[in-house]
Amino acid sequence: MPSFDVVSELDKHELTNAVDNAIKELDRRFDLKGKCSFEAKDKSVTLTAEADFMLEQMLDILRSNLVKRKVDSQCMEVKDAYPSGKVVKQEVNFREGIDKDLAKKIVGLIKERKLKVQAAIQGEQVRVTGKKRDDLQEAIALLRGESLGMPLQFTNFRD
């Protein structure tokens, strides 16, 4: 039976490249000279600046570099800024994988449209199976058209 997996993966290498490009752009910006910096750790980035408006500009720089590297900014989880001595810091975490709530929402969408496919939650991915390849392509088109708050990829398509 044909099947495919719905996953939400983050390309860590492209994320690292985007952060490195943001650091280079930060060095070139005259208005952000001083105590502005990006610190990348695994799947999170810490923004440090002297004022809140600088953090907003740094966040825009990071978003633009993510878009250039084709990393979807929907996976960004921006936390509130907090003061740390004379500087202000802000955490940006990058989410990966499909959580239970989103998986249930995906399965519910597929069942609601009464497509001739079955969806099953398997950890951090959703496996969709059906008798015909066309039904699976219809399910992919349905999920691409919905705004679910996380970037979705469709992998492991088998006939």
Curated annotation (Swiss-Prot):
UniProt family annotation: Belongs to the YajQ family.
Example of a GO MF term: nucleotide binding
Any GO CC annotation of this UniProt entry: cytosol
SUPFAM superfamilies: YajQ-like (SSF89963)
Protein's name in the database: Nucleotide-binding protein PSPA7_4966
Pfam family, one: DUF520
CDD domains: YajQ_like
Keyword line: Nucleotide-binding
Keyword field contains Cell division: no
Residue spans crossing the bilayer: none
Listed Gene3D superfamilies: 3.30.70.860, YajQ-like, domain 2
Functional description taken from the UniProt entry: Nucleotide-binding protein.
Stored InterPro entries: DUF520 (IPR007551), UPF0234-like_C (IPR035571), UPF0234_N (IPR035570), YajQ-like_sf (IPR036183)
